[in-house]
Amino acid sequence: MVMMLRTWRLLPMVLLAAYCYCVFGTCSIGTTTAPVEWKSPDRQIPKNITCANYSGTINGNVTFRGLQNKTEDFLHWLLGWGHKSICSFFPKLQGNYNEQHYRYEVANLTYNCTYNRLTLLNLTTENSGKYYFKREDANFTFYYSCYNLTVS
């Protein structure tokens, strides 16, 4: 009986691995650390910030989760320039109007955004690097979270 329970616990993981292998040929899942928001009194990225580690495969997708459920989340990537809003000011994708999905392309970076997650699409090795998300609360305090992406 105990052996049967252990087998049933592993079944979802085995099925997921088989599905990924059959559909994609490879399967890369994973964050190794959870993202944490870091308070920044001086509006700069904190020097002691810890990044959540994510990995992806070329031509695959990766989803950064754990973003604050606010429309003022911003993406600041060290690979490019400046601050860009990821969930505002861009044309809405055709489709389900109940979900706030947006898409924007710049410097080979394509993504879909909702209010609490960001999915990078069609990954290339150029997308590897650190991604910082900045949020400002009602008291004008800045918070940052960091994601370190490795694409191989």
From Swiss-Prot:
UniProtKB keywords: Early protein, Glycoprotein, Membrane, Signal, Virion
Membrane-related topology note: Peripheral membrane protein
GO cellular-component term (any): virion membrane
Main subcellular location: virion
Subcellular location, record wording: Virion membrane
Residues with glycosylation annotation: N48, N53, N61, N69, N108, N112, N122, N139, N148
Source organism, top-level taxon: Viruses
Signal peptide: 1-25
Modifications after synthesis and translation: N-glycosylated and possibly O-glycosylated.
Family (UniProt): Belongs to the RL11 family.
Name of the protein in question: Early glycoprotein GP48
